[in-house]
C-alpha cells in the first residue's frame, strides 16, 4: 500500500508536480502515461524510495517490488537464478544446501557430520519458505519471460542489460510483493512474453503502478490512468 500526501517534485529549479495526493491499495492498478519528460520515471523512483521528494510524505506499507529502467542492484557475483529465488529467501538456502551436500561427500568424519547437520537444517528452512514448489514457480516465471537455463546459471556481472532487466522482472513477479512499481516492463520481451506478462498482471491482486508505451498492456491491466503533463504540475486521474 502507498499513501501519497502533498507530494512535490522538483528537478533543479523546475517544478514537475505539486500538491499531489493519492493512494494505491490492494487491487488498485494504475497506468502512468504522458510524454517523455513529464516526470513518470522520476515519480516512480520517488514512490519506490529510491529518491526523496522535494516536499510531502509517502507512507509505504508491505513489500514493494520496483523495476527501474536500468537495474543495478544485487551482488554482481550472484547467479541469476539465486537472485530470483532470493526474492523469497530461497536462493542462499539452495547455495548452503549445495555446500552441505559437498561436505557430505567428504571422507573426513567431522566434515561429513557437519554436512549432514547443516543439510537437514537448511532443507527444513527451504521447505518452510515454499521449497521445491516455489523453485518450480520461479523457473516457470523465468521461462515465460524468455530467460534460458544457460542465463540462469550465469553471474549477474556477465549478463547484458536486457538479460539483467528480465532477471529483475522475474524476481519481482516471484516476490509476492504487496505493491509493484514497473517502469516499462515489456522492454526486451518478445511477443509471447508480453502476452504472458499481461495475463500475469491482470490476475495480480496487489497494488500496481506501471509505466508503459504498450497500449494493450495499459488497456488490459489497469483500472486507473494517471496522466502527467510536462507543462502542468498536477496529475489528471481517469478511471
Predicted regions and their residues:
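ABC ATP-binding cassette signature C-motif
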Residues: 1-239
Amino acid at each position: 500500500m502507498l499513501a501519497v500526501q502533498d507530494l512535490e517534485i522538483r528537478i533543479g529549479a523546475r517544478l514537475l508536480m505539486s500538491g499531489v495526493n493519492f493512494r494505491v491499495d490492494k487491487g488498485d492498478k494504475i497506468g502512468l502515461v504522458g510524454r517523455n519528460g513529464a516526470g513518470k520515471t522520476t515519480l516512480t523512483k520517488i514512490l519506490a524510495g529510491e529518491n526523496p521528494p522535494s516536499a510531502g510524505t509517502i507512507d509505504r506499507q508491505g513489500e514493494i517490488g520496483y523495476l527501474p529502467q536500468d537495474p543495478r542492484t544485487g551482488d554482481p557475483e550472484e547467479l541469476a537464478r539465486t537472485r530470483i529465488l532470493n526474492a523469497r529467501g530461497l536462493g542462499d538456502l539452495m547455495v548452503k544446501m549445495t555446500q552441505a551436500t559437498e561436505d557430505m561427500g567428504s571422507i573426513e568424519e567431522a566434515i561429513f557430520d557437519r554436512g549432514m547437520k547443516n543439510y537437514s537444517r537448511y532443507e527444513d528452512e527451504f521447505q518452510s519458505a515454499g521449497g521445491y514448489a516455489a523453485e518450480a514457480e520461479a523457473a516457470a516465471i523465468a521461462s515465460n519471460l524468455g530467460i534460458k537455463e544457460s542465463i540462469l546459471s550465469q553471474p549477474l556481472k556477465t549478463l547484458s542489460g536486457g538479460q539483467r532487466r528480465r532477471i529483475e522482472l522475474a524476481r519481482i513477479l516471484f516476490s509476492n510483493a504487496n505493491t509493484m512499481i514497473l517502469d516499462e516492463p515489456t522492454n526486451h520481451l518478445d511477443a509471447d512474453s508480453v502476452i504472458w506478462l499481461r495475463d500475469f498482471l491482470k490476475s495480480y491482486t496487489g497494488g500496481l503502478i506501471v509505466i508503459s508505451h504498450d497500449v494493450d498492456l495499459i488497456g488490459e491491466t489497469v483500472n486507473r490512468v494517471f496522466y502527467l503533463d510536462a507543462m502542468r504540475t498536477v496529475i489528471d486521474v481517469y478511471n
